[in-house]
Amino acid sequence: MSMDHLPIAIVGAGPVGLAAAAHLLERGLAPMVFEAGATAGASIGRWGHVRMFSPWSFNIDAKAAALLAPTGWVAPPADAYPTGRDLLTQYLWPLAEVAPIRQRLHLNSRVVSVSRAGHDVMRTAQRGQAPFVLRVAGPEGERDVLARAVIDASGTYATPNWMGTHGIPALGEMASADRIAYSVPDVLGEARHRYANRRVLVLGSGHSAFNALHDLAELAAAEPRTQVLWAIRGVSLERILGGGKNDQLQERGKLGLVIRRLLDEGKIALHTGVHVDRIADSPEGLRLH
């Protein structure tokens, strides 16, 4: 059975998903883009206050820029470093409004499963020749969509790692979810009231943790009763803080140097070798065991 008449489904309307759509359009293929959020790049809006490590030149796809050019869009300075909000307002949202993209973009449409049409665990013959079937939950309920191919550009921001040691939630973690942020909260902006003059633990050694630590230290400078704690599973920072002045991404290197300085100055209390099995409430706050 020929599948040439079917669209190519793209899951996620972030920078990768819309760039993929631009490339498919340039090749005369028909993309169909599904975005779970209310806007393109919805997950980026959750860290819109964070400045990126990579300049604009790393973040604008050439085929996407070619679609934008006829609209009068002006590319941002190539060597400037955008925030997440900049990425949305100056690039991604304008791209989502370009007619060939807009006509194929389905917002508030979450892909909940992907399978092969007419096949299941027991029926596998010629499975590779069958079209994909996507179960999509949208404003009008669930529907099934057939596609000749699927590009998963959904990202991982909505599915962060659990605090538990075993790759599953720590005991008590789900019950404490209203007191745990699994993103980079805007502690200097809209979330300031939640973190000011509190004892705050950042768990993890990725660059999201670095950004949170940086902002919490700045908050503590203005709100002196704020305490900033940092816990990592490893026992050393040598491979965590980046390449400093020699880092291939200049802004990433700078952030690592700032975190090291804050540690040296005692503005961040570091705890190494931390493995969380259980989280319990107490009069002093959450306790990690």
Question: Predicted regions: what is each one?
Answer:
Residues 152-220, 228:
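Glycine-rich dinucleotide-binding loop and its adjacent helix/turn
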Residues 218-289:
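A Rossmann-like FAD-binding core segment of flavoenzymes
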Residues 16, 39, 157, 208, ...:
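Conserved Rossmann-like nucleotide-cofactor binding loop
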Residues 6-32, 205-219:
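N-terminal Rossmann-like FAD-binding beta1-loop-alpha1 element of flavoenzymes
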